[in-house]
Amino acid sequence: MKAHDRASVLPHTGAMRTTDIHSYQPRQGHGLLHDPFNAIVGPRPIGWISTCNAQGAANLAPYSFFNAFNYVPPIVGFASIGLKDTVRNVQATGEFVWNLATRDLAEAMNTTCAAVPPEVDEFVLAGLTPRASTLVRPPRVAESRVTFECRCTQVQQLHGADGTAVDTWLVLGEVVAVHIDKALLRDGIYDTANAGHILRAGGPADYFTVGPEQLFKMHRPR
């Protein structure tokens, strides 16, 4: 009996039967009502990124592809599908700010998704307050409870496995200054469970929140 056949007839092992698995090759289509990729790789933290152009005009936009990539030094990054104003601004100034999106700021964050001309100030559009950063030129969102001031380390156009360039741009930056609402610090520890983070899910209008009820602890084996 082959290994894959054996796995399919031994349900007590916890392995799924091969007949219960939907498999596909993305370049040939997923065969479902909606591409599940974003829903599977998620929920994801939101890259709510503020930048400014060389003349100092501010821009604010959310990105659903965002995460941390290194601890020391701290490096975060986001991907932009298309060479948008945010990426152009980072290329021009070498700086950006990440602003934490929380449940109370969800509507304002969503407003900054709007496709508007470069001269439109998303801070004004969303009724948000720009606050001067300490080390970089782009402003922070004053209403955001956590902000990272970042200096760009690289901007990279992505490529597929066949070497073909993709119209998506990865921006990485070192976090050079951090600002945290002191109410979120409990005995010197950041209280993620009660900070109200919102996360991007798979559907076009789907989001998740993080709360204490989702918290569980599991230590690494020694």
Cite the ranges covered by each PLM segment.
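Basic, polyanion-binding surface patches
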Residues: 4-222
